[in-house]
Amino acid sequence: MDDDVLKRIGVLSKFITDEKKARIEKVLNLRTNYLTFVLEDIFQSQNASATIRTGEILGLSDVHVIEKKNKHTLNPDVTLGSSQWINLNKYKNAKFAIDRLKSDGYSIVATSLNPKSINLENLTINNKMAIFFGTELTGLSAEVLGAADLYVKIPMYGFTQSYNISVAVAIVMYSLLMRLRKSSIDYLLNEAEKSNLRLKYYRQVVKNYQFIENLINS
């Protein structure tokens, strides 16, 4: 565990109420990076922002955004501050995202209606997974589909063949996370990961945290 991180946490903790620290610990103890999701070139800020809010509420520590064609912008009226409590990782293209996630041990799972796709309820949860979501009109790029280890679909029983992106993310992530919480899989953050996130949260809570942290080295 990083001693510098622990030192900064110790200093900032003096400026946070016990009630707030307890709330932070409660959230940290339920955070996970075993599952994450990736948005590829989502152009509607309202939809993209809604997915960030969903990810934070469900307990994800990280989400990922590919910005090859469309820049990701947050709508504060939709995120309601959720973006400050989650790590938002951005990439210039799909390859960078895929390479990073694979190096971190994630299976690449593409949401798709192609014949190889399995139903969501049949997707196994034995490995870390990064679930990729594309636009409602065109779906994921050929690059992502070609690199995917697995393909998954949400069953649909009506005439329309596409869920709203924010709804799709909510259905998939909620389903997988509920199954994880009922399993014996060690899916929660380890102590080092919690410390790094704790420091992020403390910095969100403490005003002028940079000035306070600078005093550590003075």
From Swiss-Prot:
GO terms for molecular function: tRNA (guanine(18)-2'-O)-methyltransferase activity; tRNA binding. Gene3D superfamilies: 3.40.1280.10. It catalyses: guanosine(18) in tRNA + S-adenosyl-L-methionine = 2'-O-methylguanosine(18) in tRNA + S-adenosyl-L-homocysteine + H(+). InterPro entries: Alpha/beta_knot_MTases (IPR029028), SpoU_MeTrfase (IPR001537), TrmH (IPR033671), tRNA_m1G_MTases_N (IPR029026). S-adenosyl-L-methionine binds at residues 111, 154. The keyword Protein transport does not apply. The keyword tRNA processing applies. Belongs to the class IV-like SAM-binding methyltransferase superfamily. RNA methyltransferase TrmH family. Catalyzes the 2'-O methylation of guanosine at position 18 in tRNA. This is tRNA (guanosine(18)-2'-O)-methyltransferase. It comes from Borreliella burgdorferi (strain ATCC 35210 / DSM 4680 / CIP 102532 / B31). The lineage of its organism: Bacteria, Pseudomonadati, Spirochaetota, Spirochaetia, Spirochaetales. The gene is trmH.
